[in-house]
């Protein structure tokens, strides 16, 4: 997201950055606690932190072909009763609640583990 900035591809003058990488749920939690000067967050938490942070013009992870996505095992036509979400304070979870309120069982998992969990059932 901040590749050019953190990897020295643009001149930042005397500014230096200390970069930390975390799961989106941890980033959301950290922003809520004011831990970072700049952070990626889920759009769903913006109202809760807007008093302390400003939204940047770039860096969004929403759009055609990227998150949030609803996936299931190929050939499975049963009604969806439970889903894995990348955190309870994420845009994916907020949209799930609005679009599919009947799916009440939402299990938070690291984003990188969701596909394998879906495959396993």
Regions found by a protein language model. Give the residues of each.
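N-terminal hydrophobic or amphipathic helices and topogenic motifs
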Residues: 1-61, 68
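Bilobed "Venus flytrap"/periplasmic-binding protein-like clamshell domains
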Residues: 1-8, 22, 66-121
């Amino acid at each position: 997201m901040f590749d050019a900035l953190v990897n020295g591809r643009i001149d930042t003058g005397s500014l230096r950055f200390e970069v930390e990488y975390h799961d989106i749920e941890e980033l959301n939690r950290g922003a809520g606690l004011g831990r970072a000067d700049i952070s990626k967050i889920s759009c769903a938490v913006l109202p809760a932190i807007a008093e302390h942070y400003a939204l940047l013009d770039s860096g969004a992870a929403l759009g055609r072909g990227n998150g949030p996505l609803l996936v299931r095992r190929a050939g499975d036509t049963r009604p969806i009763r439970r889903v894995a979400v990348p955190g309870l304070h994420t845009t994916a979870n907020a949209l799930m609640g609005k679009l599919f309120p009947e799916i009440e069982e939402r299990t938070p998992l690291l984003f990188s583990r969701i596909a394998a969990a879906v495959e396993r059932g």
